[in-house]
Amino acid sequence: MAHISATLVKELRERTGAGMMECKKALVDTQGDVELAIDNMRKSGQAKAAKKSGRVASEGVILLEISSEQKLGAILELNCETDFVAKDASFKSFAEEIISTALKEKITSSELLKAKFEEQRTALVAKIGENINIRRIAMLESEALGSYLHGARIGVLVSAVGADQKCLKNLAMHIAASKPEYVNSEDVPSEVVNREHQVQLDIAMQSGKPRDIAEKMVSGRMKKFTGEISLTGQNFVMEPTKTVGDWLEEHGATVLNFIRFEVGEGIEKSTTNFADEVAAISKKEV
């Protein structure tokens, strides 16, 4: 039997909302395969939906900077260990220097930035006593760029055609709040669609419906699924009776691309207390 770590159980709990023992059993059944465990739990009704992977967040800041010509934008995530340091003036100044250099020299590789700023990073670590990591950098280039920064923890860059700055700002705010993964439903990769289709079909078939009826049920569910994860298919947060796609059409605008960063997405913190909890339960089962 595969070893099921506390970390795996914790991830499955966070992504499904199911109980610890249900998650542990599901992982045992799948030999530690989290994605397969999620699919199986959804089919059995133990998990209504799976949250996008993103374990307990690390600390740090998101920074945005747009060129003077307003045609190139950069977005950076710089991590530290505590919220206290994230608010430190020296830490913020370091982040600002990194993003300004990245934008000026068009550096889109975090590894190149790490090499370039290693001496300053080491000195700052020695000064404040916490590890600091240049986690990621990205850029967006377009004739029309919009941006939004929410409390230095969520940042968005968005490019579009036919949109003024007010329209772009509203779009960026929506993206920050609603977390779309793709621009249009047609952009959702076939493997993502196929996987969800199979899960929904298995759920529908369990109700005892004939396959043709089940397929019709799934068709509606899939339209909802792709709509919810694509920008243009989501209900617009500022006018919930309209989709973003409808709102864009009214304004004669088309979104080309967007980038959304949130501090600590997918970064795992220490799970000591949770591990102790799992270990205690494991001992009871022996």
UniProtKB/Swiss-Prot annotation:
Signal peptide: none annotated. Residues 82-85 are annotated as: Involved in Mg(2+) ion dislocation from EF-Tu. Disulfide bonds: none annotated. Keywords: Cytoplasm, Elongation factor, Protein biosynthesis. GO terms for molecular function: translation elongation factor activity. It holds the Pfam family EF_TS. This is Elongation factor Ts. It comes from Hamiltonella defensa subsp. Acyrthosiphon pisum (strain 5AT).
